[in-house]
């Protein structure tokens, strides 16, 4: 049988020299002819394998195409027949170091040869195609049959060639793709390479904390300044410099063959710069003067491995062209089939072909410059240089900038109306990706702020209890508070025991907090900082049963937030906002306020006025009896001393304004009383910001907005039992008062039984109860007007009515018969002196006696001795949630007491000071009237304060259960005596409940806290890759083709075994994120809906739950148990998607509650939104105890500031932010796993430690590779460290920093800055701010539109 050799399946004509296209065309034509021979009619021709023929063809086409692409500049191609059997290769290179000759008796360096080891990386690629059985059958038929058979045969042959061409094309693309992936695996980002080149360390030198931190900071800065450098501007020098830095930052190849890829001027290409088509086109446009098309001499052959006897690689030499068809078939089936001589066609003198390439001139070097768009076009594989990027942004809402420190840095003059929206911003403005202005205000964040979890302290308290207690000095500062509850009837008996003991009372945490200024509060030496974990709850330590326990109580009102977190000026600015909203037309009350202030602070206040107050005690009939006396007292003191009497008593003011309009008193004095009442009503109308007609849970909605309207807050001075519509527990003795235990006063008859019990603990009340309107006005007076105008220089007092009446009035002639009573004068010196002091010295004895008798006539309406009542009541339904369900607020009120504004001396034995409330506990009055208190003040002079520093008796000092706490008394002690101060105290009574927050937010009133908004956006980006010439060797052999026959088809599998060897002396390739291709998310204002994230939580009260969900925009009710279980287990989205999306995928903004005093500079540079840095380069993250300490130990300063934190509500362990966004707590919260949280990466401890370990490893490994293999460990393999890809794609997570977003608190500032393109500089305009962006996205977006 004739043995067909390759003569009929090999080229018959030599291909034109150095022409790639001719090679490809010629090879394809010969394959077609050879296939006809192969499928001819002679069976003897089957001795040449069809699979081998396909493999040789694919090899030829595959490599010819590879050599024509610019990426081949970075390759060094080597043939090795046994590469498929090689799993791990190790190539040794002997490199002789260059030397410099020296003189002047300096010893020259010795000849040095370094052996560098490079490891191979196996990466096979494969492709397959199917040929149907029908097609193969037609191929096997002879060409000599009918015309139809020949046509079918030719069609079948074309089918084979199409499949073969597609497979060969796939191998071409696969080879380039595999090589590109290999380059990327050893191409660290440029910012890493530059940082390591600047901070080179010896490979055996351990990095210090300072070095590691410096490198980390340099990495961060270079990353942020190099991102999207093609989009930032069209500055040629800037872009040229970055590209030049890319080229200079990499090392040369070990194989420096200048014959490959050389221009006609014999200038070798130093490397190749590759990128996606968009970036390359942009570079071509910008750097056109440096770009040219040159004819380059490209290789069309590859090297060959030579194997020694020991089967080890000993050298690399360049050998013949790839095994062409001629040489293969000549030796096929012979003894010389494994010996391939040099090709006769491509000899040494003709081993290169001319190829046109785009080149870029960088300095004195020439690099290839192109894209691989044609490789990936219309394929299902993305260009590896087109990558995704995830960036997280943060920006503030509601940060307060004090007007006294306000200034403007705006170059262009921006005029803002003088409105409180501009003076206390409650909105933030920014642009989305389509340059549409977005606005977020407090009403928009209600789905996060009004969620039940936010108003539940259960987990906060539990986590704080699980922590170790303070030790040492901090224990003595924080853990000395004792809660003393005592029978109200015994409080008066033991009232002065504290002062008699002369022991200093330890300050509670609230007092300590409010003694600090804003800057000191955030410092690590603030011992109370660990207790500030929640904006709506006070946390502290108490002593109970000789053990230290954690106490958590609701703050109830905005005014109870510590002043360093909500300062005085903020409360006043917020009050102005309420005034503006209410459109309050403030009349001129200045003169009235001035005279009232002078009267309240005057040291010469008549004691007769206190006696009259005691006799009248708010009773209209008693007042009418004493009307003449009262009018004379008022007239004398107003005309002679310019003092307005009875301005310390609400009941007296109301009685005077209602019943003395008949010119009994001077008109000016009466006008002041009327102005006082008008002012109180004005305050009431101003703070009524909700719809008074709306009801919720059977109560007016305004009750939920401001505590002054809430019946649960009682007036501190009462003379008759108030309405108890809220079922408060009122106690005067051992048992709570009820309708049966409270007795009624019978003034019109001889009430002997009441007179006998006048000094007992039995409580008597009038038949007439004050109206709800009167009760609200009285609370406004005592909690707002009086403290603001007296600066807390008032004191509660009790009166021993029994002894007072007996000593002053049960003497002659008061107890004489009527005739004798009318005729005889009064002889009581005490009473006469009181009358002369109160009425003036001009009265005769007869006149003073007449006045005394008038006083005596009012005794028919006398009240009982003063009592202290304890009021224990739960909060409103909106605040009764979570742990607060069982919370009972405590108030102590004076029943039949009075408010002193000056000490009583003459009647001291009948009146006793009762410091029962911080508004009414003036140490001056107390010390003057009680010797024990005066001694106490002399012993501890620092306690002589009106701001809460004067200690109250322990049963009355229940700070954490009271409604008004230390911040109230601190403000009222130092506030100016003005209408604004009164309004501010009233506004501070705004509640911290979800209903109150919703009402205020929807009315554009600041709710008392700020917010940090965090959003993650996704981007498609384009990267540039630079690689030096011959940076990587590609080891290959012929493709292996196998056939798998099936019933209906035969599958042919092509496998190309490849192995890659890095040839760089160091990092020979690098990448850079150059161009923003697409913004995938909308960069908008969609707020995270916590009702979907935590779906099963609901408020305790069903009506409250329904109201909240409706007013914050949650349409669906709470899910059923089965729905909730499915959501928790499998995840779910509890809302329908919007019908129209104008701006793409919605990015979610999450809310972190933040103090309004957070430094605005915190938002002007990249920081961790939790308020404390989490990237711990100064700590070994493998030491988890030290790492956790760096994260959560606030006794240490933050790594970026001199403070411990900027937001304790998020940075402390177990704080509100930590609970919401730390995934470790989600099991306790029943979390919806389908909800994406951009904040989780900054709060989850396990993720933070993991990324820190990865960052630590990345820096350490790159430092080891910062030197080349010539001056470091020659075994180092220069490839990207693990985690580099994640670092580049999610830099914010690894850096633990969010980026500032271009935003402003006022739309005018945003438009002004956008108009000038000044978006990267942060500015301040008095109370408004504009935050500059780190990456100029606005400029990038504008240039791309």
Swiss-Prot record:
Xref: Pfam families: Herpes_MCP (PF03122)
Compartments it resides in: Virion; Host nucleus
Keyword Coiled coil applies: no
GO cellular component: host cell nucleus; T=16 icosahedral viral capsid
Main localization category: virion
Recorded GO MF terms: structural molecule activity
SUPFAM superfamilies, per the entry: Major capsid protein VP5 (SSF103417)
Cell inner membrane keyword on record: no
Swiss-Prot/TrEMBL keywords: Capsid protein, Host nucleus, T=16 icosahedral capsid protein, Virion
Function of the molecule: Self-assembles to form an icosahedral capsid with a T=16 symmetry, about 200 nm in diameter, and consisting of 150 hexons and 12 pentons (total of 162 capsomers). Hexons form the edges and faces of the capsid and are each composed of six MCP molecules. In contrast, one penton is found at each of the 12 vertices. Eleven of the pentons are MCP pentamers, while the last vertex is occupied by the portal complex.
Subunit structure, interactors included: Homomultimer. Makes the hexons and eleven out of twelve pentons. Interacts with triplex proteins 1/TRX1 and 2/TRX2; adjacent capsomers are linked together in groups of three by triplexes, heterotrimeric complexes composed of one molecule of TRX1 and two molecules of TRX2. Interacts with scaffold protein; this interaction allows efficient MCP transport to the host nucleus. Interacts with capsid vertex component 2/CVC2. Interacts with the small capsomere-interacting protein/SCP.
Family listed: Belongs to the herpesviridae major capsid protein family.
Protein name: Major capsid protein
Organism: Human herpesvirus 6A (strain Uganda-1102)
